[in-house]
Amino acid sequence: MKIRPAEARDRERIHEILVATAHFTEEEVRCAMELVDQAHDEPEKGDYFVHVLEEPDDGPVQGYVCHGPTPLTDGVFDLYWIAVDPKQQGQGIGQLLLRFVENEVRRKRGRMLLIETSSKESYASTMRFYERSGYDEISRIKDFYRIEDDKVVYCKKLTPS
């Protein structure tokens, strides 16, 4: 498997993965795709970086990740989106994508990676994934997204490489 910058040809597959996960609302999928488009259309801005993980020899894309620097901070980055084809989940693809982003952040002299997620029951495995990956829950805003759906913020401090 290899991780590479997303290209225009990956857009449809990224959309398919987001829809197939069944975690995201239509509005969330639209938001995620806006970041994919912005990363592709305005790379010089450096606001968003999108990468895909594909099988060797240009095989199908199995997952994608989007991250970028947090505005008005020194060395803080956000993981905006991470999604893996549901048929491929549990095979370490999410872990590979997350470690890739951590290494990219270190390479860019980043010191902290933040992840925001929902507290909905359907996200329980996602939250366990972040915790197993060394992220600490640092904030929880009750009823942020909607009643009984908190915003949970995870953080991992990184040592720049």
Question: Which residues are covered by each model-predicted region?
Answer:
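Conserved GNAT acetyl-CoA-binding A-motif
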Residues: 105-118
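Conserved active-site tyrosine of GNAT-family acetyltransferases
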Residues: 129-130, 135
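Short hydrophobic/aromatic beta-strand or adjacent loop that forms the aromatic wall/cage
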Residues: 48, 149-153
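Extreme N-terminal starter segment of soluble prokaryotic enzymes
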Residues: 1-2
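Conserved beta-strand-loop-alpha-helix junction that forms the acyl-donor binding cleft
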Residues: 115-126, 144-148
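Glycine-/small-residue-rich active-site loops that bind phosphorylated ligands and cofactors
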Residues: 24, 85, 89, 121-122, ...
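Conserved G/P- and acidic residue-centered "switch" motifs that form tight phosphate/ATP-binding loops
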Residues: 92
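Acetyl-CoA-dependent GNAT
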Residues: 5-87, 95-100, 104, 108, ...
